[in-house]
Amino acid sequence: MRFLLVAVVAMMALVSSSTAAVAETSNDINTMNNNQEFARSLRNTEERSIAAILAEAGEEDRAAWRINYRAWYKAKLTPTQVKTVLGVSQAEMNNVAKQLQRLYLGYYSFYTAMEKKKEEKKRLATP
């Protein structure tokens, strides 16, 4: 009985190691396809918008930025010097400003529409 158990365990070890060796072999075509799929996934990722970044920014992040502001102010850096240190171009700043303006205008139109609905409900509710 013990001999049979040892034989079964040895056979299982032999079979499992042979399938592991087979699983590791791959040809160049599979590797190329995997690389193409990986490259495609990188191209399909969208850049995060300013709204998404602001939504994820917590109080800790904002506190860290305050610390940077204070350090820059104590170092007597002007805003143009900070822009140079950060490596931000004017075109990038304009793009960010446009995205923030779109975000604000979108919320403003949503807010005014909701307020108009509220006023309309209030007007219809009163006889």
Swiss-Prot record:
GO terms for cellular component: extracellular region; host cell nucleolus. The keyword Zinc does not apply. Its main location: secreted. Residues 1-20 form the signal peptide. It comes from the Eukaryota. Residues 72-107 are annotated as: WY-domain. A motif (RxLR-dEER) lies at residues 40-62. Keywords: Host nucleus, Secreted, Signal, Virulence. It is found in: Secreted; Host nucleus, Host nucleolus; Host nucleus. The WY-domain is involved in the homodimerization leading to a novel trans WY-domain configuration in which the Trp and Tyr residues are derived from separate monomers. Effector that suppresses flg22-induced post-translational MAP kinase activation in potato and tomato, but not in Arabidopsis. The perception of highly conserved pathogen- or microbe-associated molecular patterns (PAMPs/MAMPs), such as flg22, triggers converging signaling pathways recruiting MAP kinase cascades and inducing transcriptional re-programming, yielding a generic antimicrobial response. Does not suppress programmed cell death triggered by the P.infestans elicitin infestin-1 (INF1), or by co-expression of tomato Cf4 with Cladosporium fulvum Avr4. Belongs to the RxLR effector family. Forms an unusual trans-homodimer. Interacts with host UBK. This is RxLR effector protein SFI3. The gene is SFI3.
